[in-house]
Amino acid sequence: MAKADKATAVADIAEKFKESTATVVTEYRGLTVSNLAELRRSLGSSTTYTVAKNTLVKRAAAEAGIEGLDELFVGPTAIAFIEGEPVDAAKALKKFAKDNKALVVKGGYMDGRALSVSEVERIADLESREVLLSKFAGALKAKQSQAAALFVAPASQVARLAAALQEKKSAGDSAESAA
């Protein structure tokens, strides 16, 4: 690879690091081209799965201000650059690694810090943002209904008490007029 090509590759990878909300570093030893194509399809359009030379990736990470990943760039390494929601991509990688033992998740990077394998797996085990938001909205709606019931309850109790007093008074007046 010519020096100019390497510089371009480093700049491209550094740009991907900067644009990504998260990255997951994997080892793909033993995967076929068709396996890699299947993995890329399963990751969706918000994730770019890139195979690059470790030395170039290390330089690009340093250029992008990413620290703590150098020890992951050993052996055949590929990186999933995730733009947007990291949960779906982490789920897809975890499922693919479960089905294809040749794919090994080495770690990742998110929110300015390196992630261990277990942290990447925990992200994969989270529910998607949409599911969490809908659960939150449901909880808020339930609390609003409970609050509304609390506000309405005293007024209805007062109304029932007034009706009972009125009934009792009417019954008392009827008894006096009958006597």
From Swiss-Prot:
Entry keyword Ribosomal protein: yes
Quaternary state and interactors: Part of the ribosomal stalk of the 50S ribosomal subunit. The N-terminus interacts with L11 and the large rRNA to form the base of the stalk. The C-terminus forms an elongated spine to which L12 dimers bind in a sequential fashion forming a multimeric L10(L12)X complex.
PROSITE patterns cross-referenced by the UniProt entry: RIBOSOMAL_L10
NCBIfam families listed in its UniProt record: PRK00099.1-1
SUPFAM superfamilies: Ribosomal protein L10-like
UniProt entry keywords in alphabetical sequence: Ribonucleoprotein, Ribosomal protein, RNA-binding, rRNA-binding
InterPro entries per record: Ribosomal_uL10, Ribosomal_uL10-like_sf, Ribosomal_uL10_bac, Ribosomal_uL10_bac_type, Ribosomal_uL10_CS_bac
Pfam families for this protein: Ribosomal_L10
Name this protein carries in UniProt: Large ribosomal subunit protein uL10
Residue ranges crossing the lipid bilayer per the database entry: none
One of the GO BP terms on file: translation
The keyword Cell inner membrane appears for this protein: no
GO cellular component: large ribosomal subunit
Lineage, highest ranks first: Bacteria, Bacillati, Actinomycetota, Actinomycetes, Mycobacteriales
Single annotated GO MF: large ribosomal subunit rRNA binding
Source species, domain of life: Bacteria
